[in-house]
Amino acid sequence: MPPPAWGWGSNPLEPVVHTVAAFSRRLLIAPDAAPDEARLRPLLSLSLSPPPTPPSPPPPPPEVLKKDSKAAPLTKEEVGRATWMLLHTIAAQFPDEPTRQQRRDARELMAIISRLYPCKECAEHFKEVLKANPVQAGSQAEFSQWLCYVHNVVNRSLGKPIFPCQRVNARWGKLDCPERSCDLEGSNDIIPNR
């Protein structure tokens, strides 16, 4: 293919691109078809221009951008409140007649938290609390009451108010799930069958 009348540009690959483009036109036209450009459907498109820049991601929805929100890690207190909320919710959902595995899981969960909790000082204190107050998970009521007691042990050490454990189910009762879909099912499977 001869160079175009206007000459080759500054791109050293320009002659190659033009040759490949001309060759691909010949390949894409059926032998019995007229070589009209409208019928060409290239499998590969080559261009000398730089690729277009991808569009920027859309801004987050307004509810995500709160005026008072801070872009900082959680405080020790925020992590503590969230952890207790999770633990009390788990205890509230704990079965009335747990399997041996569920009782073991409850003990193991507390042990794992005492090892992996993001506040080292808090984790060490929780280990001491667990040593003095081993996990009691024979039923939902027992586990919830034990957790409330342990939470109060921690609260006392921090000079915080004590929660009345007789109200634990009123505060962190069973989740409102249709057809008891929140109930724990005894299973040794890591990923339950669906």
Curated annotation (Swiss-Prot):
Leading EC class? oxidoreductase
Q: Which residues cross the membrane?
A: none
**Gene that specifies this protein:** ERV1
GO molecular function term, any single one: flavin adenine dinucleotide binding
Q: Oligomeric state and partners?
A: Homodimer.
Name of the protein described by the UniProt record = FAD-linked sulfhydryl oxidase ERV1
UniProt keywords (A-Z) are: Disulfide bond, FAD, Flavoprotein, Mitochondrion, Oxidoreductase
Pfam families found in the cross-reference section: Evr1_Alr (PF04777)
